[in-house]
From Swiss-Prot:
Subcellular location as annotated: Cytoplasm
Alphabetical GO biological process terms: protein folding; protein-containing complex assembly; urea metabolic process
Principal subcellular localization: cytoplasm
Provenance organism: Helicobacter pylori (strain P12)
Name of the gene encoding the protein in the UniProt record: ureE
Name assigned to this protein: Urease accessory protein UreE
Keywords: Chaperone, Cytoplasm, Nickel
Entry GO CC: cytoplasm
Keyword Chaperone: yes
Protein purpose: Involved in urease metallocenter assembly. Binds nickel. Probably functions as a nickel donor during metallocenter assembly.
Length: 170
């Protein structure tokens, strides 16, 4: 089965009305536009999203819906650094330092709280800066992502040479 577009999200439906099968994804797999996965019930699916969300797939995104059958995204819990800033200045410092490392940064559950995937160097940096943090297991959902840039991403358009293209050597 090839999935080319999202159908919606489970938060907009009553999941109890449907037979929901899940594709379990790691947080870093949610930004893939082309991939193959197996659902919990063993169905093979291929994803080739034409209009992929800029932030990536989110918890509960519906990949397939037919009558009472749904295949939806489940983002697996992973080891995450929960960061609690004490001031606006500390928020700026956290965003600068995490961004400087090109690490993913997500909104937390409360004001001035952020999450980033666990990496020892990032944890050491936060300790050195005196920023309050704790390592917990939680979901990194794309809809809560602060950073949008996708290094090494493929363009969402086709490139072709114009009919009047010429190479001139001098």
């Amino acid at each position: 089965m090839i999935i080319e577009r999202l159908v919606g999200n489970l938060r907009d439906l009553n999941p109890l009305d449907f037979n929901v099968d899940y594709v379990d994804l790691e947080w870093f797999e949610t930004r893939k536009k082309i991939a193959r996965f197996k659902t919990r019930q063993g169905k093979d699916i291929a994803i080739r999203l034409k209009d992929a969300p800029k932030l990536g797939l989110s918890q509960g995104d519906i990949l397939f819906k037919e009558e009472k059958e749904i295949i939806a995204v489940n983002i697996l819990d992973s080891e995450v650094i929960h960061i609690q800033a004490k001031s606006v200045a500390e928020v700026a410092k956290i965003c600068y330092e995490i961004g400087n490392r090109h690490a993913a940064l997500y909104y937390g559950e409360s004001q001035f709280e952020f999450k980033t995937p666990f990496e020892k160097p990032t944890l050491a940096l936060l300790e050195k800066l005196g920023v309050q943090n704790r390592v917990l297991s939680s979901k990194l959902d794309s809809k809560e992502r602060l950073t949008v840039s996708m290094p090494h991403s493929e363009p969402n358009f086709k490139v072709s040479l114009a009919s009047d293209f010429k190479v001139v050597m001098k």
